[in-house]
Amino acid sequence: MFKFNKKKLPSRHTSLGPDKAPQRSFYYAMNLTERDVAKPFVGVVTTWNEAAPCNIALMRQAQSVKKGVKTSGGTPREFCTITVTDGIAMGHEGMKSSLISRDVIADSTELTVRGHCYDALVGVAGCDKSLPGLMMAMVRLNVPSVFIYGGSILPGRFNGKDVTVVDVFEGVGKHSSGKMTAHALRKLELKACPTAGACGGQFTANTMACVSEAIGLALPYSAGTPAPYEQR
């Protein structure tokens, strides 16, 4: 009746046989059809939150991922996990949460996929610890997986030049040494980060995005497209 034979897939434990009728009832409650339940379940995880621009576009990107999964014959199952953004956390007690968050991301993603017997995983992340966190989970799970970088932020314009958050950091130093007025610093901070996306510099997010391609978890040339672009 259906295209896919799930007898050897992990999701058989939650969708095949008379004894799985209760689980299937839950799926039908979420408007899945019998045909949907008979297809491979593909987890779509993002680290979306409103903590910083790094992650703010990820939920929208996930909807495109889900369309792709459906087109390819799978049934997408979206979920989110936490992230701690270094750009907000650093310089105070919050930075103690940063590295730990990487392992929480990996652990929570792994637990969700194992707990619900998903057959494959697509992960979308946008900041320093979330990229390696999702990639760690993919390696542990050993199921078909694809990593997608949320993309870098676009530069802003200030005094006729491209600027990024790096210039704001430097501006803080200039202000502290008396080389920039408070008014100029305020104008700079208002212009430096005009869009969604990860920090516009060769920091951990953009670096790990390159690594994701190099180790084969991301598709070639997928990391370079900025977050606001429709191609992303």
Give the ranges of each region predicted by the language model.
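N-terminal amphipathic/basic leader segments beginning at the initiator methionine
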Residues: 1-36, 71
